[in-house]
């Protein structure tokens, strides 16, 4: 069974919706992982500013990405202040590469 459908109007293969990684596709998590893909790591304060999410929602989205193995959440100290840092994993990088490829295919239709 293929993961693509043939579009009757122009015979272009359209990806099945089921192959889109819904964990990444959610807008808040997409913002988080796309920034980490470029930056590799950033603290929660950065993402709070970028997403305008509440601390609880931001933590929830980060935890979902961590549970999937896409990011690591680390507590570090900058000077004497504790900081929570998010870091993309190799698995997260591969998942985002796959997501980008699928979405590029969607937008080329």
Regions found by a protein language model. Name each.
Residues 78-97:
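Basic, amphipathic "hinge/linker" alpha-helix immediately C-terminal to the N-terminal HTH DNA-binding motif
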Residues 73:
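Short beta-strand "wing" residues that participate in macromolecule-binding interfaces
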Residues 69:
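Glycine-centered, phosphate/nucleic-acid-interacting loop/turn motifs that mediate DNA/RNA or nucleotide
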Residues 62-63:
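Short, hydrophobic-biased segments on the C-terminal half of alpha helices
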Residues 2-17, 34, 93-109:
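Amphipathic alpha-helical dimerization/coiled-coil segments
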Residues 15-57, 76-79, 85:
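N-terminal helix-turn-helix DNA-binding core of bacterial DNA-binding proteins
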């Amino acid at each position: 069974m293929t993961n693509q459908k043939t579009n009757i109007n122009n015979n272009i293969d359209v990806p099945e919706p089921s192959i889109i990684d819904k964990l990444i596709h959610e807008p808040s998590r997409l913002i988080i992982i796309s920034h980490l893909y470029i930056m590799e790591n950033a603290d929660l304060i950065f993402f709070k500013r970028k997403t305008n999410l509440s601390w609880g929602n931001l933590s929830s989205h980060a935890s979902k990405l961590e549970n999937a193995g896409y990011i690591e959440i680390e507590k570090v100290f900058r000077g004497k202040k504790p900081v929570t840092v998010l870091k993309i994993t190799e698995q997260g990088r591969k998942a985002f590469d796959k997501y980008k490829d699928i979405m590029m295919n969607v937008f080329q239709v």
